[in-house]
From Swiss-Prot:
Gene Ontology terms: cellular component: cytosolic large ribosomal subunit
PANTHER family, per database record: 50S RIBOSOMAL PROTEIN L3, LARGE RIBOSOMAL SUBUNIT PROTEIN UL3C
Source organism, top-level taxon: Bacteria
GO terms, molecular function: rRNA binding; structural constituent of ribosome
Native source organism of the sequence: Fervidobacterium nodosum (strain ATCC 35602 / DSM 5306 / Rt17-B1)
Protein name, as recorded: Large ribosomal subunit protein uL3
Gene name, Swiss-Prot/TrEMBL: rplC
Cross-referenced InterPro entries: Ribosomal_uL3, Ribosomal_uL3_bac/org-type, Ribosomal_uL3_CS, Transl_B-barrel_sf
């Protein structure tokens, strides 16, 4: 199982095998192993990775203690990854984008763009009302339920509300190219989230 933490840089296109391939560029790593979790002590096997160095003044004293115990520099992002054998890793070990190869299949988890409180037409692609003269509703929701029976709105009814900022995983994305010197990874297709947003990269589970 390969994994790393990254940030979305943006999209571009590459020329490969006489075809234009749309790719998303990710700045992946370098990450540092901050902590190891074991079945005996914590009930499960996992390692905790740190990403992006940060000034000590921006962290609380308990968080600083975690990094001082591991003897590593303070990190902005901490994420846990389940592993079968924690003995393969050591605290302070650096994990870079070089662990991946061109053609690898990976799963990418990100958070979609937050669009705030949105109406039913934008959030659920509702048709809306008539646009002609005389109509008193154009972008409204419409009927949401009956009056006398059942005299309530059913759970799950699609209505206006907060739209976006949801955790989404893209399965089986293909690694197109790697720039290990600059910690860059180019994957085929799109990746959820805005430019600069955080993404989690793992080896594909369903291949």
């Amino acid at each position: 199982m390969k994994f790393i933490i990254a940030r979305k840089v943006g999209m571009t296109r590459l020329w490969k095998d006489e075809k234009v391939v749309p790719v998303t560029v990710l700045k992946a790593g370098p990450c540092v192993v901050v902590q190891k979790k074991t079945v005996e002590k914590d009930g499960y096997n996992a390692i905790q990775l740190g990403f992006e160095e940060v000034n000590e003044k921006k962290l609380t004293k308990p968080m600083l203690g975690v990094f001082k115990k591991a003897n590593v520099k303070p990190m902005r992002v901490l994420k846990e990854f389940r592993v079968e054998n924690v003995d393969q890793y050591s605290v302070g070990q650096e994990i870079t984008v070089a662990i991946f190869q061109e053609g690898d299949k990976i799963d990418i988890t990100g958070w979609t763009k937050g669009r705030g409180y949105s109406g039913a037409m934008k959030r659920w692609n509702f048709q809306g009302g008539p646009k002609a003269h005389g109509a008193k509703f154009h972008r409204e929701l419409g009927s949401v339920g009956q009056h006398t029976e059942p005299a309530r709105i059913f759970k799950g009814k699609r209505m206006p509300g907060r739209y976006g900022n949801e955790r989404v995983t893209i399965l089986n994305s293909e690694v197109v190219t790697i720039d290990a010197q600059n910690n860059l990874l180019a994957v085929k297709g799109g990746v959820p989230g805005a430019r600069g947003s955080l993404v989690i990269i793992r080896s594909a589970v369903k291949q």
